[in-house]
Amino acid sequence: MTELDLQQYLLSEYPQENARCEWKEYKNLKNSFCGDEKDDVISYVSAIANMEGGHLVIGVKDKTLEIVGTDISRLTFNGQPANAQSATFKLTEQCTYLSSEGLNIEEFVTDDTNKRVWIIHIPKHLPRRPVLAHKKAWQRIEDL
């Protein structure tokens, strides 16, 4: 898939940010996956799960959906290079009460520009069980 094809796909499937969809640039996931609370991937996953579930698109510019790609080359889990499967496992490990059912990371790498985009599909929290990240239940206030 070319970068243009991927951008068209993203625009058709995830046309705008809303309560169920967030776009994040995160050019380098090494310090962004489980990093500063509130600004890292696990905090966003918690917040989206605690609404109705949805999608986190990583590797695109906020507001424009321009593909910038994300670098996972220095991201490791337990000393092993990260991939979509190990990142999914890490999410369930770091996000208390996050259901693995419906949780999925879809990975796209453009053929022409070699840019990587991850789409994290996030299930809704279980009844009376908010999803925690950094021992807190996150919520998307601006989307209420």
Where are these regions (language model features)?
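Conserved N-terminal catalytic/coupling substructures associated with nucleotide/phosphate chemistry
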Residues: M1-L144
